[in-house]
């Protein structure tokens, strides 16, 4: 990948971008180029960082950028925003929730394995209130085929993490 990053790394603008980012630690906006160039610039500028967050205007652009980003970083993922249109949320609710949980799972795995990850989302995806990652970690339940499960303990654990018990 250095073949793709080296020409950009020598540009004064990229060097200034890296320096500004290291000094301030603040988010950086890249504009004035097409989306595929933005992905190339992002990966060249922040290649040394393990966690990268790219925020874009709409879902279609975010998904397209995620596909482009996979060329530079195989662990690039798209974090979908919560669907605020109730009809659409009802139809796609489980699919979106599943995608978001898979994304959180990959972030936790990257953090545990000390690997790089690039998360691409929309501004609406940033509005979503999430629990801290440690709370997700603390509430992961593992089962083996040979386990004997105490249903009352399992029920109390599930209720404790937010599930609702309903009569069958």
Protein language model features and the residues they cover:
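ASCE RecA-like P-loop NTPase motor cores
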Residues: 1-168
């Amino acid at each position: 990948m250095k073949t793709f990053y080296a020409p950009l790394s020598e540009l004064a603008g990229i060097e200034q971008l890296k320096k500004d980012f290291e000094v301030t630690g603040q988010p950086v906006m890249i504009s004035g180029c097409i989306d595929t160039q933005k992905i190339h610039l992002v990966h060249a500028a922040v290649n040394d960082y393990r966690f990268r967050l790219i925020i874009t205007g709409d879902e279609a652009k975010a998904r397209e950028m995620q596909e482009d980003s996979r060329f530079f970083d195989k662990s690039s993922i798209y974090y979908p925003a919560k669907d605020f249109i109730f009809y659409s949320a009802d139809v796609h609710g489980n699919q979106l929730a599943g995608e978001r949980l898979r994304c959180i799972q990959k972030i936790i795995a990257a953090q545990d394995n000390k690997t790089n990850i690039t998360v691409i989302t929309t501004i609406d995806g940033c509005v979503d209130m999430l629990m801290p990652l440690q709370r997700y970690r603390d509430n992961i339940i593992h089962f083996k085929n040979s386990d004997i499960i105490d249903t009352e303990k399992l029920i109390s654990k599930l209720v404790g993490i937010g599930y609702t018990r309903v009569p069958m």
